[in-house]
Every structure is written in C-alpha cells, then in structure tokens.
C-alpha cells in the first residue's frame, strides 16, 4: 500500500535533515509495536465505550502458595456459569455482551473469588476484561440482605482521576443492574462543600485524596470494607503524592481486606512497591513480549516553531473531525490558549484539564463520549484509562517528557507516550497518532521513543496537505487487517 506511505522530504527539508544526516536519523524499519497500551476496558458499549476485542497473548500466573500448581484446573475457568455466580450477576454479564471469560478473566476470576480471599497483583493491557474482573469479584462479595448493609461501604475502588472513577461506576451500574438495592457512591473532588454527611453506599469509587479526607472526617466508615481495588495501579503508586495517599488510605482500612491491583504496566520499582502494598498476593501477568499496541499508525510532522505547531494543528482540523480526536499538550495554560484561539477562529473544540471544576469536567467528557464535541484538548489527565470508542486520532502537540531538573537533558516519558497513543486504535480498530516536532530537543525525544520501542515513526511532508489528508483518511478508514503499520 505504497500510496499510504509518507513522502520523504528532499535533502535538507526536514527537521531530521537539519539536525543530523538522513542516513543516521532515519529509524530502522520494524513491524514491532510499543509494548502495552495502558488502557482500561472500562466503559461498556452502552456508555460510548468499546466492545471487548481480545488480542492474542498468554497469561502467566504466579501463586503466593509456592507449593500449589498454577496450571491446576482449579485456577482456570472456561465459562462464567462454572464460578457459581449469582444469576443476577450473570444477567449483568450478558447485558455487557460477555459470553465467556477472556483469557485474563479465565485465570483472574478463580483467584479473586477464592475463599478465604487472597490479594492479587494483576498486569494486563486494555481490552482484556480486567475492569469487569474486579467489578465481578466485588459484586459477588457484597451483602445486600439488609438496608443497613446496603448503605454500608463494603468495597472501595481507587482511581487516579475523576474521569476514570466515573467510567468504573458505569461498569458497575451495567453489570450490577439486576442486583436489587445496589448503591454506588462516588468520592471525587467536589465542586462545592456539598458532600453528604455520611457515605451510604455498598460500593465506593473515588480518588485517594478525597477518600482519605472522607474517612478522616467520618463521612465514610471503613469498618466493613472487604475489598480494596487500585485501578491503574502503576500510575497511582508511581505518581508523586498519590502513592503516599494510597498508603494512608490503606492504613485506615481493616487489616483483613482483600487488596487487588490491576494495571496495564508495572515497571520494576512499582511492582516492588505493589508487592509490599498487597503482600502475599497471587500474581497475574501477560507475557511482556506480547504486549503491543496494534492498529496505531505512528506519524510525525516537522514544525518550524511553536507558532507553526498551532498553524499545523488548524490545518489538520478537518481530519480531526473525521471521528473524534484528542490533542495532548504539556500544560493547562497551553490547553486553554489553543482552545481560545481555535474557538475564536470558528472551530468547535473543548478542553479538559485538572484545573477545571468537577461538574464541568464531567460535562466535557460526556459531550465527547456522545460526539457533541469531536476535538478534545487535554493534558495527561486523560492519558490513562479512558475508553471512548470513536477516537480515531491522537495528536502529541507536545511530546511527553519526564519532569527533570532544568540542568538535565530532556527525556521522553515512554509510558505516558504509550498511554496517550493508546486512546486510539481501540479494540480492533485502526487509529493514528501524530507527534509535532519543532526543535532539536523534541527531535531527540522522538528518537528516544523510536529506539525504546524499536519502532518507526514516519514523517509526513506537510507541503502537500491534500496528500496528508489522503494518507490519514485512508489509514483511518481501513480495517486493521488491511492497514500497514510500522513499515
């Protein structure tokens, strides 16, 4: 499909040519994709999310009981009926179009549902059914027999952002829709001081700081909690402040609580932390070499400076609205400025950053899910876990980088890049990611990303916007089986 390949710029025409020799700067061809996409299979199709599309991979299990055989049939299940679930939960699974367990669920569910409860540290990419796995475990352990227990917190799910928390609530609502008297509470930063005097819910989903505050103020009573789940656990434990907040929350909970950590990525130091956070846990992982982001065409555009970045973005606007698109920028200020300029020029865009109040953030993400807003400008608040089925393009307006002291060379943030581009190409569909490069530092960071993931990010020549449009439209509209990636 040569017509889809970006055209190489004449010698001296691209940023790469200006910085280094073409033969040295051109990345080696590779069909291997970055490891893992960091997404959460959170939003059911009824809420604008994606249907489960299971990739090929193998699941490895390491049991805390070293004498036990992880390949024992007791530690695997081929259908939901074999788990002895409440028929009403089976109805909920059917409503989610879950006909049989995914590979992750085959191994995770027997471990999660075992009695006495055991801790679990699970690493799995998105689209594997991990959200449904921990929600199913929670619903199976609830006691809803009395009004008092219906209003008593029995399970707590912690998420790094308000948006992911709301998405998880949506999964619980769909899977638990046939359970009478199921009450779900949210503990996220409030816009005003309108918190309830008491948290009366059997399942609570929230962010660490708000949950800790509600427990300390006795708004939420943790005495009857049976299950603690950390979703996007690597983000929670690795992000400055959130890791400490998680520790403080856990210290306020019953010692017998079942701790479950699920995430798409577990860097070594975070895995060590997680092992302490969930001691004597069963471990479940995907074979690392098979964790890939498939179906994402990775491209980059040369820009002469910051202003040229903006002009390029405006030129891309028509393509951004083919489906839905997310534009990732470095700072809240950049997001606001770009939104203001584009709206003034008559373009329909929305922005979502951590600085926006809660209810407004909810409204923006709901509009984006519904398709009322097709272009969303955001910081890394959306880089993880949000599943919106219509996203076909991601723009790295600013290449993600680690926060390092000013005197150190700029370093690309590989995990954030992975999570960002994972917003597109969701569950079997084709997507496009485009990175803007405007200076030597950004070019170096792009090269770091290519080398780290052993992949090729192709350059598009912006001299012919008709050709750019043709390349991207053909890629988006192609079924994944017909698309070419990393070539």
Curated annotation (Swiss-Prot):
- List residues of the Helicase C-terminal domain: 295-468
Topology in membrane: Peripheral membrane protein
Name the enzyme's class. Answer: hydrolase
Where is the protein found, in the record's own terms?
Answer: Cytoplasm; Nucleus, Nuclear pore complex; Nucleus membrane
**Motif Q motif, residue range(s) on this chain:** 78-106
Q: Which InterPro entries match?
A: DEAD/DEAH_box_helicase_dom, Helicase_ATP-bd, Helicase_C-like, P-loop_NTPase, RNA-helicase_DEAD-box_CS, RNA_helicase_DEAD_Q_motif
UniProt feature, compositional bias: Polar residues? 28-40
Q: Which residues bind ATP?
A: 124-131
Q: Where is this region: Disordered?
A: 1-50
Record GO terms (molecular function): ATP binding; ATP hydrolysis activity; inositol hexakisphosphate binding; RNA binding; RNA helicase activity
Q: Where is this motif: DEAD box?
A: 231-234
Q: Which family does it belong to?
A: Belongs to the DEAD box helicase family. DDX19/DBP5 subfamily.
What free text does the record give on domains? The Q motif is unique to and characteristic of the DEAD box family of RNA helicases and controls ATP binding and hydrolysis.
- Kindly state the subunit structure of this protein: Associates with the nuclear pore complex.
Name listed for the protein in its UniProt record: ATP-dependent RNA helicase dbp5
Gene (name only): dbp5
